[in-house]
């Protein structure tokens, strides 16, 4: 069905804004927004620039996470809704949903209604290619695959190579290398090419840039400053319009439909900016929804795992020996200071990183996970034994992923079925009210 192109004369916004009326708070200390990866699980590339609390001593921004995050406080601050038991029962049966890893959302019911009725619905989950992918990066992609297989969702995967060039001290060539490497890991997840579109900002600039420009007209400097604070370059000031393009692209290509964005909670401000743009009714789109998740903890404790800092990570290409060495050397333990004390008082699985990895899905059996937790609390299971369990499960998952990755052929050939078609590009531009100009090269 042909969509009616919007005009530039958009009506006044009569729907409530998702952007809070407060200025960006400023974190104390060194400004390290670009020293910590934005990719805490989905790098869908979050209302205020930061969420800081002097009592709990944590920091959450789209560009940095530090300290022990108070997830309930973030929900109050961001205005999202906790997932209900009824919603969980209708979402895919996945460990990250059953175990409250994804714990909140926006407009989840509309997505579920479309899925239940067999109507069009989409998932958007992307990646900022600033380095090799690690465990925290790939989990949202496997969740998206589960959605695709169980609900029939179309999955859109944007790669924000442009934003990483702007936000990181890396060359375009280096970002390009990371992009190609990351694409192999994304393809290895096993998405259905008929219902998956992978978009790379610089490679697909013919459609991304005109739409982003169209959306930028409805995004004020005051909004960008309120959400992100001061930006170092005009490129980063413009990037929220590109991000909004990612989230609205499924509807511009295939018409209005509920769209759900599974993301780590630090990335929620990006979704709210896009929802604010969609509410202006300048384009034939609905507000995208969100599924908000907790961070896969960094090996050394509170916070999230990062591929861009100095903290240790488990890369998707690590061999079993490297995984074992990394976990034994760096994984924060919830055990006691001595064997005797551990046997007597037991350990704390809620802070033990090896257990948390099992909880995030590497131990798929809920009953077995509960048994491991009980044994650890009683002192029957030692910290070293718990680490060995985590190593075994993680290496099994990585081995399967690496086999699929190694089986891929030429990247351009493998990627081709996942790219936007010429008709899809034209439809998206028309829906956004952007005339497509095409001139032959000299």
Feature locations, PLM:
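Short alpha-helical segments and helix-capping/turn motifs at coil-helix boundaries
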Residues: 106-109, 139-143
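Short, glycine-rich nucleotide/cofactor-binding loops
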Residues: 128-138
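A conditional alpha-helix N-cap/helix-loop micro-motif detector
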Residues: 101-105, 137, 231
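Short, contiguous strand/loop micro-motifs
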Residues: 98, 130-132, 169-170
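Alpha-helical recognition segments enriched in aromatics with Gly/Pro capping
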Residues: 113-127, 142-369, 432-441
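Non-catalytic terminal extensions that flank enzyme cores
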Residues: 1-128, 275-324, 328, 334-337, ...
């Amino acid at each position: 069905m042909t969509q009616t192109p919007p005009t530039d004369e958009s009506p006044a916004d009569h729907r409530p804004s998702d952007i809070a009326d407060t200025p960006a708070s400023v974190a104390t200390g060194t400004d390290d927004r670009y020293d910590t990866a934005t990719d805490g699980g989905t790098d869908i590339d979050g209302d205020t620039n930061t969420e800081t609390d002097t009592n709990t001593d944590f920091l959450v921004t789209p560009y940095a996470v530090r300290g022990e995050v108070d997830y309930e406080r973030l929900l109050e601050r961001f205005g999202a809704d906790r997932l209900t038991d009824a919603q969980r029962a209708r979402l895919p049966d996945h460990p990250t949903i059953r175990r409250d890893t994804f714990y909140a959302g926006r407009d989840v019911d509309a997505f579920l209604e479309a899925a239940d009725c067999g109507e069009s619905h989409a998932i958007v989950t992307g990646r900022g290619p600033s380095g090799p992918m690690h465990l925290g990066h790939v989990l949202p992609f496997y969740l998206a695959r589960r959605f695709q297989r169980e609900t029939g969702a179309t999955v859109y995967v944007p790669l924000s190579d442009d934003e990483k060039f702007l936000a990181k001290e890396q060359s375009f060539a280096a970002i390009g290398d990371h992009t190609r490497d990351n694409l192999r890991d994304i393809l290895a997840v096993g998405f259905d090419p008929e219902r998956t579109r992978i978009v790379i900002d610089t490679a697909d600039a013919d459609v991304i840039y005109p739409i982003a420009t169209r959306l930028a007209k409805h995004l004020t400097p005051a909004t960008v400053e309120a959400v992100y604070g001061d930006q170092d370059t005009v490129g980063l000031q413009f990037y929220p319009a590109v991000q909004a393009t990612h989230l609205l692209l499924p509807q511009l290509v295939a018409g209005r439909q509920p769209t759900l964005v599974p993301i780590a909670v630090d990335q929620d401000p990006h979704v709210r900016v896009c929802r604010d743009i969609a509410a202006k009714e300048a384009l034939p789109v609905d507000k995208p929804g969100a599924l908000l998740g907790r961070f896969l903890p960094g090996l050394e404790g509170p916070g999230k795992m990062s591929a861009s800092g100095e903290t240790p990570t488990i890369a998707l290409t690590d061999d079993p020996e490297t995984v074992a060495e990394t976990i034994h050397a760096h994984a924060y333990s919830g055990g006691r200071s001595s064997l005797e004390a551990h046997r007597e008082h037991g350990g704390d699985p809620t802070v033990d990183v090896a257990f948390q990895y099992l909880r995030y899905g590497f131990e798929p059996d809920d009953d077995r996970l509960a048994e491991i937790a009980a044994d650890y609390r009683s002192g029957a299971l030692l910290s070293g034994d718990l680490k060995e369990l985590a190593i075994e499960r993680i290496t099994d998952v990585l081995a399967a992923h690496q086999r699929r990755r190694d089986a891929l052929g030429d990247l351009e050939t493998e990627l081709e079925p996942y790219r936007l078609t010429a008709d899809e590009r034209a439809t998206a531009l028309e829906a956004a009210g952007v005339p497509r100009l095409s001139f032959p090269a000299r």
